[in-house]
Amino acid sequence: MNLATIKVTLPELIGRYQSQADFISIRLEQSEGTQISLRSDQVETLSEGIAMGGQVRVCHQGGWGFASFNRWEQLRQRLEEAIAAARLIGDDETLLAPIDPVQQTFINPLTGKDPRQISLADKKALCDHYNDLLRGTSDKITTTHVRYSDSQQTVLLATSEGTLLEQCWWDLEMRFAATAKDGNGVQVGRETTGSRRGYGDLENLDQVVQGAAQRAVKALTLPTVQGKTYPVVIDPILTGLFVHEAFGHLSEADMLYENPDFLEVMSLGRRFGPPELQIFDGAAPPGHRGSYGFDDEGVPASTTQLIKDGELVGRLHSRETAGKLGEKPTGNARCLNYHYPPIVRMTNTWIGRGETPVANLLDGIEEGIYAQNWLGGMTNGEMFTFSAGEAWMIRHGQLAEPVKDVTLSGNVFKTLANIEAIADDFYWDESGGCGKGGQNGLAVGCGGPSLRIRDVVVGGDAA
């Protein structure tokens, strides 16, 4: 039995059980793809496969039941189990923001090379080529890692409200890392690239790959930045990381709707940044890794403005969070795959382009930091710490010597308020894989212009 055969049976199946619950949703998926992982001279993963499965979500009197399965014949049993669970725990009112049911097929087509037309041997040869570039950069490179993945996903969604959706899309990603060692010093360089357009976006990346290894080797001999508070200029890639990790997660309404104190902090109308600051999230802009037609609750993709002219004006919702807060759903309920229920997730998150010429961002900075790209980061509520991939000192308004081990830390609200200039450049970074609630690696897009921020705490050697 295939998805097309099952699709026509879903409305009737839901109809048989509709009287037993307030809301029923069935989501079925089939995916096929390739996974390759090389570590130094070892092949860790080399596989092609097809996966299929489904999930049932049921809400009754505010209680949710969830069940997943990987054999189609288990669907009815899992539906009954989810209904029983929801009826067991439900003791309140079911509040789901209303939406119009849709019957539609949405296909996000490839615009470049189809990965299915590329043999597994050729995909591995591409990984071998990039791995050789990393390893051949310097004899100081001790470990390399190349990872390739492509997948085509087809999803069916049927609900007790009459929605019957079919969506199909591709996602491709490559990750590169090189570790350099010299005596007791160890440095790492990383790059990631992703696409929903085609296999060609993963080809001809020699300069990008070599750059990761070269940064690791170069950093071995660089001085460590002196840790203190600086004015900092960050490039668009770091801006994208900052807006996603530090601010975007705080805009997800499932962080707010049962936390009155934090809901007060994130109250609409509160000023967080300068009048030039505009922040958005949305799956509606086409061609990005966080783009789609409908979310996993059947809500149409949209663009939500989160900050307008420096003030908080919106947040990201599922139907439940929107219903409980009396707001409109935004199309941000997503799940990684059928094993997990949809939760509020970002899609494509960006800061709007400003008006300050990039060349003017360093003007007037006597001593500061210019940071670009990223190595990693973490957030804890409103606090964040990010590691820059590369950094230079700014002296007397000019770029000066490169430095290493630059970490940027702070409170997101104070940092937004300390934005001094928003540049007129812009870049979309398609390397993102977001993690939340155990659902790690969800494809997202991040974007933004270069920013100038005052009073950023920069870690390094003690002053």
Curated annotation (Swiss-Prot):
Record Pfam families: PmbA_TldD_1st (PF01523), PmbA_TldD_2nd (PF19290), PmbA_TldD_3rd (PF19289)
Any one annotated GO CC term: cytosol
Entry EC no(s): 3.4.-.-
Keyword Hydrolase annotated: yes
GO biological process: proteolysis
Sample GO molecular function, one term: metallopeptidase activity
Keywords: Hydrolase, Metalloprotease, Protease
Stated family: Belongs to the peptidase U62 family.
Biological function: Probable metalloprotease.
Name the UniProt record assigns to this protein: Metalloprotease slr0863
Originating organism: Synechocystis sp. (strain ATCC 27184 / PCC 6803 / Kazusa)
